[in-house]
């Protein structure tokens, strides 16, 4: 007996209690603000995780559920990831700098540049409002640019910002 579990549009069973067939229950055990889900995948159905409205799974780790409450489209570094992009601030509006970076890289969170000067140069060239700098010591002079903010004190990977925990020092030459 179908009992309403069959999705007419796809011809698949898409209920978390009947995912792909009768009594094929999607496992739970997710963290807060998350629940089991069932979705079409090609010609079959697969179990997954669905976030509660207003919550986002930033790190794709079900064990901690949907860990980020979406608060705003825009975000400035203030200790809270308000737009749930995985960065305290707005990743789409920033250039990233890390001691492990390379000035030949594009300045993204996974390919940061090495110097603050290069970060400022890129921000000006491609119209980014912020430069986010991981904690550490950076050599070289910098020239601030109009309309570009520089924020230090970021953790490795840029997920968190605390200027006391991840001190950032720029040593001019």
Describe each PLM feature range.
Residues 90, 124-125, 143-145, 162-164:
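Extracellular/periplasmic catalytic domains that process cell-envelope and extracellular macromolecules
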Residues 139-142, 158-160:
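Short active-site-adjacent helix-start/loop capping segments
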Residues 102, 130, 171-173:
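Glycine-centered low-complexity coil/loop motifs and glycine-rich tracts
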């Amino acid at each position: 007996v179908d009992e309403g579990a069959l999705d007419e549009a796809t011809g698949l069973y898409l209920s978390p209690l009947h995912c792909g067939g009768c009594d094929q229950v999607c496992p739970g055990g997710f963290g807060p603000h998350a629940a089991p889900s069932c979705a079409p995948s090609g010609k079959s159905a697969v179990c997954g995780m669905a976030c509660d409205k207003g919550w986002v799974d930033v790190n794709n780790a079900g064990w901690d559920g949907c860990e980020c409450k979406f608060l705003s489209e825009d975000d400035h570094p203030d200790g809270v990831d308000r737009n749930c992009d995985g960065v305290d601030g707005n990743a789409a509006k920033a250039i990233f700098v890390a001691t492990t970076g390379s000035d030949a890289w594009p300045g993204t969170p996974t390919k940061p540049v090495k110097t603050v000067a290069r970060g400022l140069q890129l921000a000006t060239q491609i119209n980014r409002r912020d430069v986010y700098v991981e904690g550490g010591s950076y050599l070289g002079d910098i020239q601030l640019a109009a309309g570009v903010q520089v924020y230090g004190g970021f953790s490795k990977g840029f997920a968190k910002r605390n200027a006391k925990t991840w001190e950032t020092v720029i040593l001019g030459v």
